[in-house]
Amino acid sequence: MATKFPKFSQALSQDPTTRRIWYGIATAHDFESHDGMTEENLYQKIFASHFGHLAIIFLWTSGNLFHVAWQGNFEQWVLNPLKVKPIAHAIWDPHFGQPALKAFSKGGSAYPVNIAYSGVYHWWYTIGMRSNQDLYSGALFLLVLSALLLFGGWLHLQPKFKPGLSWFKNNEPRLNHHLSGLFGVSSLARTGHLVHVAIPEARGQHVGWDNFTTVLPHPAGLQPFFSGNWSVYAQNPDTAQHLFGTNEGAGTAILTFLGGFHPQSQSLWLTDMAHHHLAIAVVFIVAGHMYRTNWGIGHNLKDILDAHRPPSGRLGAGHKGLFDTITNSLHIQLGLALASLGVITSLVAQHMYAMPPYAFMAKDFTTQASLYTHHQYIAGFLMVGAFAHGAIFFVRDYDPEQNKDNVLARMLEHKEAIISHLSWVTLFLGFHTLGLYVHNDTMIAFGTPEKQILIEPVFAQWIQASSGKALYGFDVLLSSSTNIATQAGSNIWLPGWLEAINSGKNSLFLTIGPGDFLVHHAIALGLHTTTLILVKGALDARGSKLMPDKKDFGYSFPCDGPGRGGTCDISAWDAFYLAVFWMLNTIGWVTFYWHWKHITIWQGNATQFNESSTYLMGWFRDYLWLNSSPLINGYNPYGMNNLSVWSWMFLFGHLVWATGFMFLISWRGYWQELIETLAWAHERTPLANLIRWKDKPVALSIVQARLVGLAHFSVGYVLTYAAFVLASTAGKFG
């Protein structure tokens, strides 16, 4: 007899109902729960999957390069990056009529195309690519790399090449290799590429496979390096008149500390970036030699952690026991990794627009908006995932004996204090922020706008001033010419930085007022509420006052019957589920704020944001409603235009989002009845009843229905806002 899906669970494969399929899919990646799984095999499977993951990433990037080279307009764009619209790829759609063919043939193409809003053109241009040939070479290289990684993944599943468990748990060598190799050497390689290829190309000097061994990146060669006279590499930088991509106004410096932006491209100086990556490379390569391996020198991580004990002795055992706890729990490792990656992704969102690293990207407003929104949403999902795996760690991997009185145990012991403090913060922020907004709404509605409560963000303005913003008149740190901080940096990076921060032509330290003060606190409310739900979910994952034995029920149980006074909605999974809604809510406010503030600045109409953002109706009317007009008019009785695709996506996003509620607001009985009815109708419908199935249709479980609802809600939410951002920005700025 053929074995049924899933092969990894005998119990599930013998289930006679449709539960077999859904639970099979749901637990396919929960390797720990599979039949016959050993710890060693678990690590080997996950390790091999990393190769597959990298292969997919490189294949995807290769596809980007290939399609732009084949169907894009990279070479035309390079000649005029500010005016030519970058093409991502062609569109072939048999439904297109003449108006659609005409509307979507843009960016200088004779056929319908998609415009690229990802910033890849700016990225490839900045790193020195100039021709389609360069793009094809890159695509081919990444394709080969992808194939090699797939082979590597396969190889590491073969008996002779499977690493043993001790190799996976060998922390110090892994840390050394990741610090020196992953961060250090890759940063050094980045510096090398910038110095040898990107900077010469930015100065009009072509560097390719044909001449890279003969073109000196600096006239003095390596002589200053070996003689210790390193400052030579910083002399004669590009001038303020430099035209990017030509030698007009170009210098010879390769490692500088100019500060600020290249006046024409409005991006960070390439020579500053090279210097930055070189410094990081040195720091990380040194850091990668700090931990003890086969030779008896260097730090031992267990010793370091065990030595981390609060001095008085009243605060417990500190980090004792953490070494083994973290080494033996993949969930806490994943939780820490996701949290770190989440933070850095959000930082990327912030820095990508405030300090654009790629030439001319600052002037491609739709790309700026897309990249910010994209990275903030990803950061949100990563952070929620971090807490989810933190909760699974407490359910599956946490050993109270091993962690007696250390930081983990103490967090669990005073979780009531942590949770209640977070609760007070959210209540305070929620009532006060909403109170101010609603008061202002009422005053506007009654025609007395002067009675609004408007609070200047003086502390934030003071911080901006200390970084050099002169507008507010604070005489502090970098905004004071006599301050020691100003004098210390005045000969190197400071003039460029001060010019940039006060120019008004970029997004560095934007001028803030009462509207910013309010939305800042609304976002703080969202962040603290999401954190409250996630922290409570993780800290209560093992048990709570109501249900002390939660751990025995696992991570994602739905309820435990009515016996204890009703135990529904209290598993760690339920906390994750609720937190995702709050996360989306918060990122929504963050991106609304960023987008509205920026489109008013880009249109030279900052007053609109300043005046309308102090009350809720202003947000609904002057941001959401006003900017949705290109979506509402994407197609109408008179035909269509090149925003029609976003209008359709806007409608479709709403549909997906609304479908989510169908799963969220109904319970099991409804589903079972619905399925029985559908099955009954199917069996009595001619032709359709030729198709039979053996599994008895059963309703989705409570947890499954919620997951399906949550997935639709999230996907629809992001899809709707993506279409809104793209259409409202592209509709204004092309």
Swiss-Prot record:
Query: What EC number(s) does its UniProt record assign?
Result: 1.97.1.12
Q: Which reaction does it catalyse?
A: reduced [plastocyanin] + hnu + oxidized [2Fe-2S]-[ferredoxin] = oxidized [plastocyanin] + reduced [2Fe-2S]-[ferredoxin]
Which of this chain's residues are annotated to bind chlorophyll a B3?
M662, Y670
Where is it located? Plastid, Chloroplast thylakoid membrane
Organism lineage string: Eukaryota, Rhodophyta, Bangiophyceae, Bangiales, Bangiaceae
What does the note under cofactor report? P700 is a chlorophyll a/chlorophyll a' dimer, A0 is one or more chlorophyll a, A1 is one or both phylloquinones and FX is a shared 4Fe-4S iron-sulfur center.
Q: Disulfide bonds, which pairs?
A: none
Q: Where does phylloquinone bind?
A: W671
UniProt record similarity statement:
Belongs to the PsaA/PsaB family.
Q: Main site of residence?
A: plastid
The gene coding this protein: psaB
- Positions of [4Fe-4S] cluster binding: C559, C568
The protein, known as: Photosystem I P700 chlorophyll a apoprotein A2
The protein's matches in PANTHER family, at most eight in alphabetical order, are given as:
OUTER MEMBRANE PROTEIN, OMPA-RELATED, PHOTOSYSTEM I P700 CHLOROPHYLL A APOPROTEIN A1-RELATED
